[in-house]
């Protein structure tokens, strides 16, 4: 019999970090929907302001608080839920659940854990308990021993035998894990590994070099009924984290015996931890015989379960929530197919490929090799009817400037076979591009296998693409059959045109004349074997007819955000989903085009139609030809939509909202700067970098520092502050590489200025605007800045000038829809530095802070005009809201943590408060690993910028009860100093509670900053923020814990 609790508390995952991303927005949203269907009151704790999940329609009550046990206890005390779900918020939620159990909070308030119980979670996540459980159940695990100290680890590694894999218990993204080939390797890194475990435990395991890694996803109900939903094959071998791996589903190289044996083991693993809901089980398979080991299991929704859900069309999170309530598998209907029960195991008539996306170029000193720790910030998922088609589509989806596996920058680069094989041995990201290059330069299958361990099945497929492309290159014209084969192999019009040395228009014209067009296929989870109703589609050239008839009417296509990267994350998915809902009032049919498996926008029940496919001009034109969309919306999905807006308009596509020509003016630094001059709007002095002589002349006039800004980029890509001629020329070179078609603008960098922004909506005549103020000074990228609503330090006079400037731009560019304007304010004079004619990164925050959905208002503005009489309207603030960045320094091996004009954060958290400091502290504490320092501990405060703020920070921390040291090489007046060597020793000994620093000091303090983040010690990288946070520590006892509506926020 199923349980029906009256009120359930759902724990979210907090801000996005590497290895814990938007998949938990998707899974948490589905869990909340499943609970709502049962008439259960829901309470959500999640500080991630950017998510769809933290909108009021999902949970009955929302608490935007740090996802830590003591904050959740306050909610439990107030709300008194009957049950708690901890399996839908990643490792963060599981850790909170275990803490609440161990501290007796759940028992005290009579709160029942729904789904897999705490003892099952501990069996799965403690490496030692998992190993013991597998052995007790006669399930195969690699030779291994656990350790809780450096000495024990070294002793056990000798017993197991080198090389060893060090796995970390209760851990996220493989943080701290490693392969140690020698005792010296182990000694060097074992302390970090132990520091990254929530329970201080590691497993020393025999390293299975070049074994195949596989994952199975399994559902299990309270009666023990199980369904295996997917088998996912990692192309990268053991030793590369699964989140870093290119994967395919269904698995391609297993024979039936291997598949069935591991399927049986998967069900046994689920039984051994008494799973109720969903888990994934990871296996290692010896490529030379029938030998396999169980590696680990995650007893919760995970990144791979989100992928499996989107790959198969099976709603894992929804079903898992129903099972947690006590339903049996046969009682739950698969909402995607609409006809089958959840006990049906999916069958696929297509191949899915997932590729991670890295942004390592943004980080100094970062280790570029793929290994046991996850470093990718996003992923893409493609669907095709051959491996080649699926892989090539996925490469284009990465949006890294490569047209497919072959024919791009790496393929045509000057690189020898030896160099290509060297890159492969080093396991660089996007290895398949180097595989293709190696084959082009004459490498054999065996040579590539030797350095990569990638199955020869896949290597042969990539070699086939190389051979075909090289054949294409010697053709003068292309015949119909060859063109058809090229499209079936996943070649884009751009790739084909490059091979033939023709234009893409030429290739498209031949395709149209020959009627070589893609067909639309449905994903129904059953490979067409069973009747189903579905709205989940992809395009392929490996088919003869469409699976559906296309409707007529007033239709809209919304372009999604694609794969996440630094600067494009879940906040843009919030905008896409908000637009879907708002647009349904104005259109007969709304479809979305996106390919990110982590998101809510790619869920089956959000859009009327979901096209899981590429976002580029070729694919959008294909869809318009079939669907006859009246409008295409490119403004909600971040930079990717804006990048194709102008070309779509040139091809006759009607864009919803602001015109492509206006977008081009805003995105082109030179055109935009000239427009500001024309309107008499103040901006920092600038020059377009057309020649080095011009740059020299400009710098001689304005002096250093200057800012180097490329065009058409997001997250400040290659945006740098240059303090010398040498830096300037290097930064100009890089900026020209990243955006070669557009001019680079050099502008004067205004020091010690306040940075502020306006998120807004316009109908071309009036503006609805929300002002945000940064805590850090101008020069820190807005995505890395701490923001407050309302503003604090800006004068009313400055804000009124900002509003006048915004209104002038809205009217001049005829802005219709959402926008964001960034200012630096010095001596009460605002200077515009940027205009984005799209939904912005901060829009979920500003919307939720003011209680007004700017995307809804954007649709009103486009179709009906804004409904207020003033030229410019800003809704009043009832309380304070503060947004803080989440950095993932600890995942990015070796990188130097510092802040500048190029974005480095991976996520954001926000909180509300009755004072600025109430909101600030809860927001800052929401980002991992931030915490309140233990009194009587040590703080390090030093730097070469914002010295007055650093000194006041130190004074506040002394008042709070810490012993504060500055560093003798960078002394602060009145603060006790120690030398750098002593400071490094204190950090390594984990005696330091917090580090507050400012400036770029890599040659001086690399070891301090790096060791601090490796050991999970909070680090504040800006003196102004350090001052405000240290002041907030003094008011720690007066934090408030209200539901979002009580602060007047939420939408």
Swiss-Prot record:
Mn(2+) 3 binds at residues 822, 834. Mn(2+) 1 binds at residues 282, 296. Its EC number is 6.3.4.16, 6.3.5.5. Residues 931-1051 are annotated as: Allosteric domain. GO terms for molecular function: ATP binding; carbamoyl-phosphate synthase (ammonia) activity; carbamoyl-phosphate synthase (glutamine-hydrolyzing) activity; metal ion binding. ATP 2 binds at residues 709, 748, 750, 755, 779-782, 822, 834. Mg(2+) 4 binds at residues 834, 836. One of its GO terms (biological process) is L-arginine biosynthetic process. Residues 1-399 are annotated as: Carboxyphosphate synthetic domain. Residues 549-930 are annotated as: Carbamoyl phosphate synthetic domain. InterPro entries: ATP-grasp, ATP_grasp_subdomain_1, CarbamoylP_synth_lsu, CarbamoylP_synth_lsu_oligo, CarbamoylP_synth_lsu_oligo_sf, CbamoylP_synth_lsu-like_ATP-bd, CbamoylP_synth_lsu_CPSase_dom, MGS-like_dom. Residues 400-548 are annotated as: Oligomerization domain. Mg(2+) 1 binds at residues 282, 296. It catalyses: hydrogencarbonate + L-glutamine + 2 ATP + H2O = carbamoyl phosphate + L-glutamate + 2 ADP + phosphate + 2 H(+). Pathway: Amino-acid biosynthesis; L-arginine biosynthesis; carbamoyl phosphate from bicarbonate: step 1/1; Pyrimidine metabolism; UMP biosynthesis via de novo pathway; (S)-dihydroorotate from bicarbonate: step 1/3. Binds 4 Mg(2+) or Mn(2+) ions per subunit. NCBIfam families: CPSaseII_lrg, PRK05294.1, PRK12815.1. The large subunit is composed of 2 ATP-grasp domains that are involved in binding the 2 ATP molecules needed for carbamoyl phosphate synthesis. The N-terminal ATP-grasp domain (referred to as the carboxyphosphate synthetic component) catalyzes the ATP-dependent phosphorylation of hydrogencarbonate to carboxyphosphate and the subsequent nucleophilic attack by ammonia to form a carbamate intermediate. This is Carbamoyl phosphate synthase large chain. It comes from Saccharolobus islandicus (strain L.S.2.15 / Lassen #1). The lineage of its organism: Archaea, Thermoproteota, Thermoprotei, Sulfolobales, Sulfolobaceae.
């Amino acid at each position: 019999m199923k349980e029906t609790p009256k009120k359930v508390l759902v724990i979210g995952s907090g801000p996005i970090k590497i290895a814990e991303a938007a998949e938990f927005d998707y899974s948490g949203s589905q869990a909340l929907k499943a609970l709502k269907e049962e008439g259960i009151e829901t309470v959500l704790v999640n500080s991630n302001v950017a998510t769809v999940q933290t909108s009021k329609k999902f949970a009955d009550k929302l608490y935007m608080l740090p996802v830590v046990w003591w904050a959740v206890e306050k909610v439990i005390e107030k709300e008194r839920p009957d049950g708690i779900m901890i399996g839908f918020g990643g490792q963060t939620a599981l850790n909170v659940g275990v803490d609440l159990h161990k501290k007796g909070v759940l028992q005290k308030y009579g709160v029942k854990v729904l789904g897999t119980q705490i003892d099952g979670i501990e069996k799965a996540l403690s490496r030692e308990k998992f190993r013991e459980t597998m052995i007790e159940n006669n399930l195969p695990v690699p030779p291994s021993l656990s350790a809780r100290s450096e000495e024990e680890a070294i002793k056990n590694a000798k017993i197991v035998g080198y090389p060893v894999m060090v796995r970390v218990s209760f851990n996220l993204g493989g943080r701290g894990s490693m392969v140690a080939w020698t005792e010296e390797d182990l000694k060097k890194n074992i302390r970090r590994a132990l520091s990254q475990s929530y329970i201080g435990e590691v497993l020393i395991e025999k390293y299975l070099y070049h074994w195949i890694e596989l994952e199975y996803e399994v559902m299990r109900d309270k009666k023990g009924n199980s369904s295996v939903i997917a088998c996912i094959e990692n192309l990268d071998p053991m030793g590369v984290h699964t989140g870093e791996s290119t994967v395919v589903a269904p698995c391609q190289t297993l024979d039936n015996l291997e598949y069935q044996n591991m399927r049986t083991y998967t069900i046994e693993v689920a039984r051994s931890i008494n799973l109720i809901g969903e888990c994934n089980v990871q296996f290692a398979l010896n490529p030379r015989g029938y030998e396999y080991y169980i590696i680990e299991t995650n007893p919760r929704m995970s990144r791979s379960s989100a992928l499996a859900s989107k790959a198969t069309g099976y709603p894992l999170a929804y079903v898992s929530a129903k099972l947690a309530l006590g339903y049996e598998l046969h009682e739950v209907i698969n909402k995607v197919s609409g006809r089958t029960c959840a006990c049906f195991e999916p069958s696929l008539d297509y191949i899915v490929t997932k590729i991670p996306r890295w942004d390592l170029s943004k980080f100094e000193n970062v280790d570029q090799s793929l290994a046991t720790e996850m470093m990718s910030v996003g992923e893409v998922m493609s669907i095709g009817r051959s491996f080649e088609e699926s892989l090539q589509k996925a490469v284009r989806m990465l949006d890294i400037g490569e047209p497919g596996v072959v024919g791009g920058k790496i393929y045509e680069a000057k690189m020898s076979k030896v160099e290509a094989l060297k890159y492969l041995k080093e396991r660089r990201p996007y290895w398949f591009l180097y595989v293709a290059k190696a084959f082009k330069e004459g490498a054999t299958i065996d040579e590539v296998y030797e350095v990569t361990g990638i199955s020869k099945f896949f290597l042969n497929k990539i070699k086939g693409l190389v051979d075909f492309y090289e054949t294409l290159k010697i053709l003068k014209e292309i015949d119909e059959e060859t063109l058809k084969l090229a499209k079936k192999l996943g070649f884009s019009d751009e790739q084909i045109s490059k091979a033939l040395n023709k234009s893409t228009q030429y290739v498209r014209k031949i395709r149209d004349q020959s009627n070589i067009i893609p067909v639309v296929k449905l994903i129904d989870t059953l490979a067409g074997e069973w009747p189903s109703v579905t709205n989940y589609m992809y395009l392929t050239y490996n088919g003869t007819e469409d699976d559906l008839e296309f409707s007529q009417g007033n239709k809209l296509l919304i372009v999604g955000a694609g794969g996440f990267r630094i600067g494009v994350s879940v906040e843009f998915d919030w905008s896409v989903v908000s637009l879907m809902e708002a647009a349904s009032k104005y259109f007969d049919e709304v479809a979305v085009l996106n390919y990110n498996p982590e998101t809510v926008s790619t869920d089956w029940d959000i859009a009327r139609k979901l096209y899981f496919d590429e976002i580029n001009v070729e694919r959008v034109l294909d869809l318009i030809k079939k669907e006859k969309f009246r409008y295409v919306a490119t403004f909600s999905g971040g930079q990717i939509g804006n990048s194709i807006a102008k070309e779509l308009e040139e091809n006759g596509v009607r864009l919803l909202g602001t015109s492509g020509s206006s977008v081009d003016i805003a995105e082109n630094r030179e055109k935009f700067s000239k427009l500001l001059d024309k309107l008499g709007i103040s901006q920092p002095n600038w020059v377009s970098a057309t020649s080095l002589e011009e740059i020299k002349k400009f710098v001689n006039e304005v002096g250093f520092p200057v800012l180097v800004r490329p065009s058409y980029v997001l997250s400040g890509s290659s945006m740098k502050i240059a303090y010398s001629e040498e830096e300037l020329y290097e930064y100009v070179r890089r900026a020209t590489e990243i955006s070669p078609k557009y001019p680079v603008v050099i502008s004067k960098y205004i020091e010690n200025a306040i940075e502020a922004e306006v998120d807004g909506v316009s109908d071309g005549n009036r503006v609805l605007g929300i002002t945000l103020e940064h805590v850090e000074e101008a020069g820190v990228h807005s995505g890395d800045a701490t923001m407050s609503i309302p503003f604090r330090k800006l004068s009313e006079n400055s804000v009124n000038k900002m509003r006048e400037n915004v209104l002038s731009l809205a009217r001049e560019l005829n802005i219709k829809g959402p926008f964001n304007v960034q200012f630096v304010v010095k001596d009460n004079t605002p200077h515009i530095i940027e205009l984005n004619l799209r939904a912005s990164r901060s829009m979920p925050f500003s919307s939720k802070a003011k209680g007004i959905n700017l995307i809804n208002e954007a649709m009103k503005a486009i179709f009906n005009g804004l409904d207020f009489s003033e030229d410019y309207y800003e809704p009043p603030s009832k309380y304070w809201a503060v947004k803080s960045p989440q950095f993932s320094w600890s995942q990015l091996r070796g990188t130097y943590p510092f802040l500048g004009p190029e974005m480095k954060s991976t996520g954001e958290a926000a909180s509300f408060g009755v004072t600025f400091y109430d909101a600030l502290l809860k927001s800052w504490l929401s980002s991992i690993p931030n915490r309140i320092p233990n009194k009587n501990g040590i703080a390090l405060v030093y730097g070469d910028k914002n010295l007055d703020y650093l000194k006041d920070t130190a004074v506040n921390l002394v008042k709070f009860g810490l012993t504060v040291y500055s560093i003798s090489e960078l002394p602060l007046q009145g603060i006790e100093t120690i030398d750098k060597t002593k400071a490094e020793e204190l950090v390594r000994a984990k005696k330091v509670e917090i580090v507050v620093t400012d400036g770029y000091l890599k040659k001086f303090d690399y070891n301090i900053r790096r060791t601090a983040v490796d050991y999970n010690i909070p680090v504040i990288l800006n003196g102004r923020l350090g001052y405000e946070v240290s002041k907030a520590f003094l008011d720690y006892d007066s934090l408030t814990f209200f539901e979002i509506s009580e602060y007047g926020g939420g939408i």
